[in-house]
Swiss-Prot record:
Oligomeric form and interacting partners: Monomer. Binds 30S ribosomal subunits, but not 50S ribosomal subunits or 70S ribosomes.
Primary role: One of several proteins that assist in the late maturation steps of the functional core of the 30S ribosomal subunit. Associates with free 30S ribosomal subunits (but not with 30S subunits that are part of 70S ribosomes or polysomes). Required for efficient processing of 16S rRNA. May interact with the 5'-terminal helix region of 16S rRNA.
Name under which the protein is recorded: Ribosome-binding factor A
Organism: Gluconobacter oxydans (strain 621H)
GO terms under biological process: maturation of SSU-rRNA
Transmembrane spans: none
Amino acid sequence: MSSRSRHDVKGPAGVSAHGPSTRQLRVAEEVRRVLAELFARTEFRDPELLDVRITVTEVRISPDFRHATAFVTRLGRSDVEVLLPALKRVAPFLRTGLSKALNLRTVPEIHFQPDTALDNAMELDEIMRSPEVQRDLNSKPE
């Protein structure tokens, strides 16, 4: 038998092959909650972020807790990609807010990614409602 336990199995980029740990999930949810509060109550000086409603849908934390990837969407619009440079500019400010709100040894560096899950679901719904698919669904098998 190998000297490595089953908990030592690593996948690509050092990520555990068994998924995130319970602590990673817990910290990620706390980071998501604090980021959502900061976006809801903070007036950003960046002109690209004025009067913009941003929703943080998910946060993933790296195994070493040094990096957090926040998946964001823009309320009512799907063009969140244009906001990514502005979000990158305010990331240090948001990290400071995280450090004040969370009791962590290392406050993660925040990286932003657009959350396309809602767009994908809407596109799939549109496809499912198309006449061609409805015809195929309603046809009787031979």
